[in-house]
Amino acid sequence: MNSAVEAQLAELGIEGYLKQHQYKSLLRFLTCGSVDDGKSTLIGRLLHDSKQIYEDQLAAVHSDSQRVGTTGEKPDLALLVDGLQAEREQGITIDVAYRYFSTQKRKFIIADTPGHEQYTRNMATGASTCDLAVILVDARKGVLDQTRRHSFISNLLGLKHFVVAINKMDLVDYSQERFEEIRDEYLQFSENLAGETDIQIIPLSALEGDNVVEKGQNLSWFEGPSLLELLETVDVDHEKGEGDFRFPVQYVNRPNLDFRGFAGTISSGSVKVGDAIKALPSGKTSTVARIVTFDGDVQEAQAGLAVTLTLNDEIDISRGDLLVLENAQVESTNHLLADVVWMTEQPLQPGRDYDIKIAGKKTVGHVEAIRHQYDINNLSTHGAAELPLNGIGLCEWSLNESVALDNYQDCADTGGFIIIDRLTNVTVGAGMVKESLAAVERGLADVSAFELELNALVRKHFPHWEAKDLSQLLKK
């Protein structure tokens, strides 16, 4: 048991501690930056100084520091996070490492992402679930290409809060002049980032512990908060709840003949019993009869809550459909523009079919054209015939059916999708919807002979289904 938990248990008792812990807000954040900027050391210092390390973990770090550490006689706190043997031996981070800790004010999930360019896909994966990015800058080196790259990817993936931590201030004698020089350079670069971003820039030393949890005497000239104070006070819960109601249906829950509910997690906004809702892409409407949770029925539910909704009308809803408020303006389209992060050796090629999964909906799609590829070192763009591993580009997609979706910046759950290779079933890329384009009508040439024959058999043997004649429909 670590000392912080032990102290809280002594003060509150086990029931009081669990109750307090249950209602703490949760912040997911990632650390990113260039190679050897000290990301893993920073997380280790954060855990150590907030008393979140168990005694056996600390003993193991002391032991390993003698063998593979890089800090001389001091314990190498980066070893708390770099868990893979290859990472420890090379002194770098390869995979995305997750760590969990809590303070008296908040719970945290940390994603420690790799800094090397060839692991850009790992960093994008880590950023996709986070609310805030801690971007480390080496005080000796200043803003590097990788700093710009990770800032751009974090911005692309919808993160609105950035903490730029200028690390290794101990190696520049805690120079205020050097801090201000790097701060101005980063702020100038950040003008190119999309949307409204909240950027906080702080100096610190992860190795010595200055301004990580406590302010420290060496940075007395800095009047802002420490890193932990920033993380404890940033408001992300309000932002999640203020959007329009979006509820992707994950499962039709029918435990008996008397109950039919639609299970899922509310992506944004809120819903109340009695609200008029609309199912997309069908457009059929109803009203909410009950909101069922694990703890029983509630009258209202907000973003992030897993619920089962029952409706007053029996309308056709299945997995992959999207429930919104009746007056919501949501587009259903089979033609869209999206930023794509490519994650496999075989490049993305226009015209090739891929499985697309978006908010529980699975369909098939292909890239019509790659509008441009981003140079993520300077945010410029250039033409590209295909998208290579770790490449990011703006692509025009066509899907086999209409899908209800939002812009990714408005709602990540209903505006983000993954791209799956149809032969290997491997996830090969991730997409972020930028805008819906005019729907593409399928021509007769796009319909196979098998589909036409099946359509004719359905109309012949199941006339009560009232299926339309495909051959006649496509001639119009």
From Swiss-Prot:
Description of how the protein assembles with itself and partners: Heterodimer composed of CysD, the smaller subunit, and CysN.
Record organism: Vibrio campbellii (strain ATCC BAA-1116)
Region (G5): 205-207
All copies of domain tr-type G, residue ranges: 24-239
Region ranges (G2): 91-95
Residues holding GTP: 33-40, 112-116, 167-170
CDD domains, alphabetized: CysN_ATPS (cd04166), CysN_NodQ_II (cd03695), CysN_NoDQ_III (cd04095)
Keyword GTP-binding: yes
HAMAP family to which the protein is assigned, alphabetical: Sulf_adenylyltr_sub1
Domain of life (superkingdom): Bacteria
Primary enzyme class: transferase
Pfam family, one: GTP_EFTU_D2
Pathway the protein contributes to: Sulfur metabolism; hydrogen sulfide biosynthesis; sulfite from sulfate: step 1/3
Entry protein name: Sulfate adenylyltransferase subunit 1
Chain segments carrying region G1: 33-40
InterPro entries in the record: CysN_GTP-bd, CysN_II, CysN_NoDQ_III, EFTu-like_2, G_TR_CS, GTP-eEF1A_C, P-loop_NTPase, Small_GTP-bd
